[in-house]
Amino acid sequence: MRASAVDVTIRADFQTFCAFDDETLMPDVSSLLRMAEARCEDRCVRFTPIRRRVFEMISERESGLRAYELLDLLSSERASARPPTIYRALDFLLEQGLVHRIESLNAYVACPCPDHARGFQLMICRHCGLVEEIHDHDIMQRLESTAAGHGFAIERQAIELSGLCQRCRAA
């Protein structure tokens, strides 16, 4: 669920931007864009017009977008758009922690908490496609502890939960 105004903690440099400190609402697209611009500037990487537009298209959706859906959208604006254009933009956005790849859907969703990109859970509604990101630190710590007990070092945690969102359950 998107919110036009969301109570988030944003430092001036946007390094700790996260809409999930106390809320489960996604920030609006303009907030996500400001966060992405600040993150890229802080990391001295170029947030090119194509990368920005791909990020914007992903941020406008509550559900994930597949690469070829992105290509169709971008092609309507830029006739020169080709699959490598989209995949390069997606690789960049993933590398910067600005989007997540939803493995089960082979789709992409905006990440409102790039500082927490190492560990997160995605709740995916199987009816309407809504994707909500949460951060349950207890789950992450238990998994790290269990893995360490087996001599395994977790580099990234991404848990996908499939079910029905509140809207679809009420319908």
Identify the residue ranges that each predicted region occupies.
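C-terminal regulatory/oligomerization modules of transcriptional regulators
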Residues: 2-32, 38, 137-171
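Short capping segments at the starts of secondary-structure elements
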Residues: 47, 61-66
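Pre-recognition alpha-helix immediately N-terminal to the DNA-recognition helix
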Residues: 52-57
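Short, locally clustered residues in the helix-turn-helix/winged-helix DNA-binding domain
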Residues: 59-62, 75
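A short acidic, leucine-rich amphipathic alpha-helix
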Residues: 69-75, 86
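Basic amphipathic alpha-helical segments that dock to polyanions
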Residues: 86-96
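Non-DNA-binding regulatory cores of transcription-related proteins
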Residues: 95-171
